[in-house]
């Protein structure tokens, strides 16, 4: 068993790549180590293309094993179940990073599995998994010539931090992941605290500069440990077939792409496709028999060439806009009467209905990871039903990877403006229902989430808007597109989503399909996105620019009290009897903590006010010189104990009672008396006198 090893340094941390010791039956197998973190990444490549495959079936699975952190899983079975959302997001991150490096038309199935075997809690293992995926591919024999690497960058006190640990990230204004080849940026994912575009661009370029070290190490490992290149074929469009279709139908296709409406355009294109199929099947084009798949792919290539050339020649886009124009926007809030907050955001043929729901601490999501269980106060969910694109399909199923990814992007875009628990004790769930989709539904979700939360009275620091940018590039000619359509995303070279406030960027997500994205293009895209974002924010601000001061009448009420910690036991009572009594009487939900914090959560203001008043009565402090109406709780030979407030009693001597002209033999437990607090000694004992009638 021969083991090959490569060692390099990344941000003052040593990283070790090793192959030959584990999972040797996989085509590629690499362990990546950093400190006490160990990630095993395997690659298996199918040697032939499955019948009927017309796409690249790449699948990436990132898995965390709880034993890696010395823990036993929760749940009845005590074993790992389906991957968490965080694991799915990391799988997507790796997929998006490596997919562009494969040749067009390569349809062999590839499966990559990254398994976290050991975890020390200091450094997130996602970048190690990404590096391992690239290394295992490089030695697998797959056609993976442009090796990819990825790094994380933080930003604190005006300085970029390479490969930050988790503590660094807690103090950082930026969490940026960049992946790419030696000469090209392929993928960007980030969350930021409203940073200027210049800082974001600087972070991307800083990250790319440090990819070379990783790529060189992977190349050295591949040079000594790589398996022979597999034999494979590349599917290519039949050029003669394409020319025949173009000669007969190009005019019709060109006219169809002057129709601005997506539905009408698709109806026209479907009719042309039908005619194309009939023409090819009924005529002997070149003596060959073509499949429907081959014909439609040639047709699609003509569409792609047409749309791209029109844009590069300065002609109007598919819907008639120029490169920088944003589609018409319509904003409404409070569209649903029975919810806590709602907004309907429509941009062209993309529409998001976003609803905000307020809850208590008990509604917070508990997220289990290798770091333990974390309480999540802000949840954002994204739903993409088939009717949003005029199709039939499965409804009510678990969210797909794409839905999870879009929800996460929208959440990261708005996380920077979300209030902390001290400022806003509610738990918040935002749900985006995509009602129509023709590009940039995730950015519509960002805009709608901001509007919906403000409608619900959530005190976000600033409104947030998002925009999706595109790119068409051919050699030195290029065009950056603002607010791209679905077709422009599909037929273009870049999908660059930018979200932020009027002050700066809160989230970036970029996927690039080609090489050679220059600094100039990135600068233009960021600046064009900034102008577009401010335009969108201006329209949103005309409807609502600050959160509502009060929550909706149908929203629950919450009140936070800070009392003397010693009084918590009085609020709770023996065996919880006191707090249970308050809950039963008022219907409120009450949570207490040893620090003295009491949270009262109620369905309406009346219920909350009643519960707060009862708690205030229990915890109120007796004061000297004050008169109280109390009840006798205990009779003694020399006097009585009178309950004043909550569990606070005072002693009333018979001498004081007789002095006030009342007979002591007539006193009974439960009898009401009006008493004056004469003094409170150092031990907290209260002496009373009777107020004369």
Curated annotation (Swiss-Prot):
GO terms for biological process: mRNA catabolic process; RNA processing. GO terms for molecular function: 3'-5'-RNA exonuclease activity; magnesium ion binding; polyribonucleotide nucleotidyltransferase activity; RNA binding. SMART domains: KH, S1. Coiled coil: none annotated. It is found in: Cytoplasm. Gene3D superfamilies: GHMP Kinase, N-terminal domain (3.30.230.70), K Homology domain, type 1 (3.30.1370.10), Nucleic acid-binding proteins (2.40.50.140). Residues 556-615 form the KH domain. Involved in mRNA degradation. Catalyzes the phosphorolysis of single-stranded polyribonucleotides processively in the 3'- to 5'-direction. Component of the RNA degradosome, which is a multiprotein complex involved in RNA processing and mRNA degradation. Mg(2+) binds at residues 489, 495. Its main location: cytoplasm. It comes from Francisella tularensis subsp. tularensis (strain WY96-3418). This is Polyribonucleotide nucleotidyltransferase. The lineage of its organism: Bacteria, Pseudomonadati, Pseudomonadota, Gammaproteobacteria, Thiotrichales. Belongs to the polyribonucleotide nucleotidyltransferase family. Its cofactor is Mg(2+). PROSITE patterns: KH_TYPE_1, S1. It comes from the Bacteria. It catalyses: RNA(n+1) + phosphate = RNA(n) + a ribonucleoside 5'-diphosphate.
